[in-house]
Structure formats: structure tokens, C-alpha cells
Amino acid sequence: MRALEPEDLELLYTIENDPEVWDVTAIGAPCSRYALKQYVASQQTLGECDQLRLVVALRDNSRAIVIVDLSAYDAIDRRAEMGIWLLRAERGKGYGAAALSLLEDYARDRLRLHSLLARSATEGNDAALALFRSAGYEQAGTLKDWHYSKGKYSDMALFQKIFGE
């Protein structure tokens, strides 16, 4: 797991502009390479902007395939929200679970966070729901009719993982 680099622009562009991602997240609109290039160039620390975006790359060839985010960071309560996005061709290979484990280790051990919150649309996002459940996240609540996609509203599940002291 590492910080975003300029060479990650195509990964970011592919994920941010994937309509399947729009269907289950709040992204919902195309993003230009120019805007993403500016975003990568302006990366700040988690404490400066309450968001940290990292990349997970394969060990054998260093090819970046996963983006993980920490956002809504609260240093006092030691919590953050997290997100995870995989390239479509890399789904179903265990990379999501591995990336989530790396992010949790970083959040717990380096940032000393007490808890992580994950949101997942309940329709069309079965893999994410299964990932969070298998990683020990508890469903802490449901936001009714929270996400609009393909002409209808769906619920948003809230998952929380609390780390031991």
C-alpha cells in the first residue's frame, strides 16, 4: 500500500469513470483526466484535509489495482470512514480482502484509529456486503432510500469495525 503517484492517473480515471462504481457509490458523474491530475498533485495528509487516498499494488509487478480511502477523519474520536475500489478485471480474486486488511492494519497500527465505518449500497453491491461481513464488520444501521441509481432508491448499509485497545 502506498500514496498516490502521478502514474496512478489511469487507475484513478478508470475507477472514477466506471458506471458500475457509480451505481453503488456517491461518485455518480464522469471525472476528467485533468481534474484527477490536479487531485493527485494536490494530495495532502489525512490531518490536513480529512481524506487519505492510497493505492494497493501487486507484489510481483507493482501494478496498481485497488484504491482505498479514509475520509471523515476524526482525530479526537479516532475514527474514519473507509472506501475500497477494485479494477473490474481484478474482482473476485481476493484482492479486496487483502487491501481491506492492509488498510485496517494501517488505520489501527499507524493512525491509532479506534473504529472504521464503511457504507455499502444494499442493491447491486453483494461483493462489498460479503467482504465487510467476512472481515468482521458489524452492520451498525441502515439508511433507508439513501442511494438513487437506475431510476430507483435503495438502502445504504452502514458497517463498523471497532479495534481493540
Task: Please place each PLM-identified region on the residue numbering.
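Conserved GNAT acetyl-CoA-binding A-motif
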Residues: 109-121
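Accessory recognition modules or surfaces
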Residues: 93, 104, 117, 151-161
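GNAT-family acyltransferases
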Residues: 1-89, 153-154, 161-164
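Conserved acetyl-CoA-binding loop-helix of GNAT-fold acetyltransferases
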Residues: 92-106, 126-134
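Conserved beta-strand-loop-alpha-helix junction that forms the acyl-donor binding cleft
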Residues: 118-129, 146-147
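Conserved hydrophobic/aromatic "anchor" residues
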Residues: 4, 106-108, 137
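PDZ/PDZ-like domain micro-motif
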Residues: 90, 147-148
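Conserved acetyl-CoA-binding loop of GNAT-fold acetyltransferases
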Residues: 133-143
